[in-house]
């Protein structure tokens, strides 16, 4: 049975534009730390350079740190398959400027088992700080004809048992009953190769407000 394709994306737009994306290794490895163990990703900077640059902006700035995996979309007829979704959710303080969608028709990548791809709203260029990881092949998310699909940009190297564990967690509430009742904390996201290149943009979530003195 085909899964719903409406994927939650972020709200708000940053007001500044980061510098041009630096050159990266052809494959950039990133580790996502969770309470259930690490997930290691290989990001395909050769075939999806803009999407990888966007994701690494969040990683190198620490914008994913302390966020969560908050959605589990299971296939109704085969619940061990589907995708999990994580990222900044609707935290507009952490969002980076939008970027053009790199479709699978452009990159040659496909939504196979263990693919990481960008979540977005209905607008093709609305991807930002939320992503999903597939369990099982999901060709319905690939570009086809006038349908742009979603921006696949890498794959899981290790940690599929962690992903499957998150996929199996209880859900309910919004997003068609797919929101995790207890989101799984994304403790930190760190690159394992290449050189970090922070965007240099402001990090308002780190700014602590001072208590006003009592009168």
Which positions does each model-derived feature cover?
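Bacterial N-terminal signal peptides
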Residues: 4-14
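Cyclophilin-like peptidyl-prolyl cis-trans isomerases
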Residues: 16-215
